[in-house]
Regions:
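Short, C-terminally biased terminal segments at protein or domain edges
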Residues: 1-124
């Protein structure tokens, strides 16, 4: 459906994932199977679901996978806030990540709205 490297939303999600890997590298080793693993999994899920949706043959399926990616972004947002509250992640590191996530969520929503219009136009 789309070339991944041309999807700005996918590129931004990849960059976010790299940033999450970097910040979680400094988390306590006791969190290896906790917040480190959960945060990284949620982060990886975002571009992965965008990619899977883009590889599908319908706008409806793509829209569904964007919804899953968006859900993962909210999961990641929550995990990063928890890490901050537990003093594993300072505000200086947290705030840019939250801004990045917020921007990605807005882009995802906008993309979903565009796909929804295409889906509805096909029904006519």
């Amino acid at each position: 459906m789309n070339k991944l490297n041309e999807l700005k939303i996918w590129t931004k999600a990849i960059n976010l994932t790299v940033d999450v890997y970097k910040v979680t590298a400094s988390f306590p080793s006791a969190e290896r199977f906790g917040l480190i693993s959960q945060s990284r999994r949620a982060a990886v899920s975002i571009p992965s679901n965008i990619a899977e949706g883009a590889g599908r043959n319908s706008f409806k399926e793509f829209n569904n996978f964007l919804g899953i990616a968006n859900g993962s972004s909210y999961e990641l947002q929550t995990q990063l806030v928890i890490a901050n509250k537990l003093e594993m992640l300072d505000n200086e590191s947290l705030n840019p990540l939250l801004m990045h996530i917020d921007e990605l969520q807005k882009m995802t929503y906008g993309f979903q709205q565009m796909l929804e219009k295409k889906i509805n136009n096909k029904k006519m």
